[in-house]
Structures are given as C-alpha cells and as structure tokens.
C-alpha cells in the first residue's frame, strides 16, 4: 500500500505563501500610508500566522508497506529555517506497537519497533496534513501488519 499527500502538501504551502504575501503587502501599504498602529497590528497578525503554522507542524508524508517493509518519509511543509527530511524504515516483523493520537484537530503517529537492544519508539509524525481517509488507511495497514506477524 502506498499513501502520499504530495498534492495536498503543495496546496497547503501555496496557500500559506500567498496568504503571507498578502499580509506583508497590507503591512507595506499601511507603512506607506504612515499608519504606525496598523503596521504594528499587521506585524502581530503575521507573527501569529507564522506561529500557528509552525505549531500545526503540517508534514508531507509518504507511507509504503510493500516488500515486507514499512517506509515512511516525511518533512514539514512549512518551515522557516530549513527542511529536515526524515525517513523511518523497518521490517513488518519489527513492528511492536503504533498509536495515532488525535488532539485539537491534529493527528500524530507514534511507532514502536523491536531492535536488537530492545524496543525503540520513533518520534511522533504529524499526520495533520493528511485527510481522515488517509489516516484511516495508515491505521488499517499498520493494524493488518500487527495481526499478520
């Protein structure tokens, strides 16, 4: 099974960038009109806008369960500094547990696998940029892997 939210991620990034440009342009218009209070309010709105985007941690996610391995590639769609590309890959037999935690409209995936040194838990992966159907498909695929071990 293969799941990718590439199209949705591109749309999210495009919308974020266009909205950010509009906010900055409004701020520049207020600056040109010498409306200092409006410039400060616009700067505050922009800071809150960027802060919310960083808090949401919307990620591009590629999920694949073929060839007896689970492969998950992900990176933040909206990143101020630099993108950190991450990859998780493990054999189906190594999967010990997984949890999809939903809170405040966001979903995070946590995976635990068996290694030579014991059980290791990967950092949470934000699934907030995926649709409910895609999250459900990932959950079903991982549940099936757990059953078939």
Predicted features, each with a name:
Residues 24, 42-55:
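Single-pass alpha-helical transmembrane signal-anchor segments
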Residues 52-89:
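Conserved beta-hairpin
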Residues 111-149:
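A membrane-cytosol interface segment of integral membrane proteins
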Residues 101-112:
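Short acidic, Gly/Pro-enriched loop/turn segments at secondary-structure junctions
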Residues 1-35:
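N-terminal membrane-targeting/pre-transmembrane regions
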Residues 85-103:
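Phosphoinositide-dependent membrane-docking surfaces
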Residues 35-43:
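Short, aromatic-rich membrane-interface segments at the entry and exit
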Residues 2, 9-12, 42-43, 73-77, ...:
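Inter-domain helical "communication" segments and dimerization helices
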């Amino acid at each position: 099974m293969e799941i990718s939210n590439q199209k949705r991620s591109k749309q999210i990034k495009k919308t974020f960038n266009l909205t950010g440009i509009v906010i900055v342009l409004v701020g520049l218009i207020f600056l040109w009109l010498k409306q200092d209070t409006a410039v400060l309010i616009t700067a505050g709105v922009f800071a809150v806008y960027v802060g919310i985007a960083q808090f949401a941690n919307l990620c591009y996610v590629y999920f694949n369960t073929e060839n007896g391995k689970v492969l998950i590639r992900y990176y933040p769609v909206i990143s101020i500094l630099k993108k950190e590309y991450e990859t998780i890959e493990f054999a189906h037999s190594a999967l010990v547990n997984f949890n999809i935690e939903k809170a405040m409209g966001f979903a995070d995936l946590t995976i635990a696998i068996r290694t030579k040194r014991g059980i290791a838990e990967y950092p949470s992966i934000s699934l907030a940029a995926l649709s409910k159907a895609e999250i459900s498909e990932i959950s079903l695929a991982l549940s099936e892997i757990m059953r078939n071990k």
